[in-house]
Structures are given as structure tokens and as C-alpha cells.
């Protein structure tokens, strides 16, 4: 992929062999779906194919995998003996999604600038960027308490944004940015 966090040089610097010739490789490992025209026949692939739930937009991908006699190991289907998923990026998707949302607020109101998350080298730099900004006086609704929701909550907590109860969120005015975290039951009981 051309969208990467680490360059070939960084892999080489760590002693890994980097080659554009993958003809001898038996297994290809990635994260996102591989473009259909990039699939190599008779290989084994590990990636999130987004086909396990019969997603119609990836039907052609699955058909190409079958046609090219590819063995697919979908990250989403890798589970332990209790059927708990072993690989899931939901938590990190929540972190990056919330970061991008905060970044968008800064751009919209022209009140601060955050670099793109991919430009930050590590978690320390990521957290530091968030701690150094001030949001305008906003009310933020965070929906969900699962992995994605917990990741997003972590970003708001790093920024020391005050968490408030649903009733207060709906009825009070605040002199600072605040957020409320709603779960499914909250959403079924209120009309926002």
C-alpha cells in the first residue's frame, strides 16, 4: 500500500529484508482489503476482507479470491477457544475517529491546528498534541460503549473534557466543553 506509517527504509534499518518481488512469498499479511487487481493467485492472505457478514460491496472481491484459488484468513474470523475475536481494531478506530473529529472542529472554527494522525510518530506525540489544544464551548455526544466508543472516550478524557450525565447534558448550559456517552438504552429513552 502507498498509505503507510513506516517507510521501506525504516524496515530495512531494523534488519528486515524489503523486496518488491513477492513471487516466493507463501503468505501475504495486511490490514485492509486487497484491491482485486492486486490479488496474486495461489497465495494465502491475511486481511480484513469485509465479506464475512455478506457485505454486498465486496462480493466481487470474494469471487476473485475463489477464482484465483486464494486461501483467505480473515482477521475478523480469528477467535480463541471461547470465540472471542483475537484481532479487532475497533478501539483504535475509536481513538483515530475521535481525533479526526476534534481535528475537524479545529479546522471548522479556525481555533487550533492538529496534524493528521498518521503524521504523529507514536502515542506520546499523539497524546501531547491533544493536550495542547482548547476546544470551544461545545456539547459532544459520544454514542456507544463498545470498543469504538471506549477508544473515542479515551481521546476526550486525555483532553480533560468533562463527562456529564444525560439529564444534565439535555437541561444545563456549560461554560466549558462537555460530553455525554450514550449507550443503546439511553438512545431508546431520549430524543435528541
Label for each model-derived stretch:
Residues 1-64:
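An N-terminal-biased, well-structured beta-alpha scaffold segment characteristic
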Residues 114-129, 160-178:
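Short mixed-charge
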Residues 190-192:
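Conserved small/polar residues in nucleotide/adenosyl-binding loops
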Amino acid at each position: 500500500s502507498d498509505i503507510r506509517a513506516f517507510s521501506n527504509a525504516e524496515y530495512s534499518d531494523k534488519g528486515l529484508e524489503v523486496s518488491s518481488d513477492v513471487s516466493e512469498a507463501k503468505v501475504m499479511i495486511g490490514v485492509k482489503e486487497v484491491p482485486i487487481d492486486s490479488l496474486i493467485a495461489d497465495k494465502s492472505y491475511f486481511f480484513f476482507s469485509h465479506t464475512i457478514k455478506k457485505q454486498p460491496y465486496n462480493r466481487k472481491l470474494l469471487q476473485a479470491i475463489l477464482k484465483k484459488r486464494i486461501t483467505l484468513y480473515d482477521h475478523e474470523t480469528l477467535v480463541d477457544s471461547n470465540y472471542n475475536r483475537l484481532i479487532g481494531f475497533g478501539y483504535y478506530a475509536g481513538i483515530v475517529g475521535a481525533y479526526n473529529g476534534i481535528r475537524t472542529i479545529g479546522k471548522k472554527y479556525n481555533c487550533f491546528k492538529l496534524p493528521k494522525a498518521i503524521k504523529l510518530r507514536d502515542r506520546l506525540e499523539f497524546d501531547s498534541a491533544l493536550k495542547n489544544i482548547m476546544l470551544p464551548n461545545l456539547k459532544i455526544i459520544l454514542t456507544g460503549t463498545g470498543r469504538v466508543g471506549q477508544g473515542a472516550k479515551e481521546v476526550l478524557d486525555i483532553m480533560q473534557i468533562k463527562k456529564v450525565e444525560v439529564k444534565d447534558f439535555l437541561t444545563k448550559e456549560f461554560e466549558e466543553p462537555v460530553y455525554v456517552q450514550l449507550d443503546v438504552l439511553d438512545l431508546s429513552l431520549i430524543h435528541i
